[in-house]
């Protein structure tokens, strides 16, 4: 629909490690809250790659003018900035490299 904005397509392909992390994130019901205009969100998506992001199903668009926006969900979760990961009800703000995503999964309840 008119007025909805989408993030840039993800250019990178997922490494084996990124795909494994994506499976673990999905199994834990993880969510990545972000916005179409957020450069760090784009960086986070590139770190995981197109396949991991596409299969994971954990991206939540928080910008009200973004395609498929779920702004109310972001507000309800208490998201203050982007990107913010949610795992086990805990929020983990900021862009993460693969090692940090692994640590996040290990430390989440």
Residue ranges, per PLM feature:
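Short, flexible loop segments at the rims of nucleotide/cofactor-binding pockets, characterized by
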Residues: 8-11, 61-63
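N-terminal targeting signals for export/organelle localization
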Residues: 1-7
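Structural microenvironment flanking redox-active thiols in thiol-disulfide oxidoreductases
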Residues: 64-73
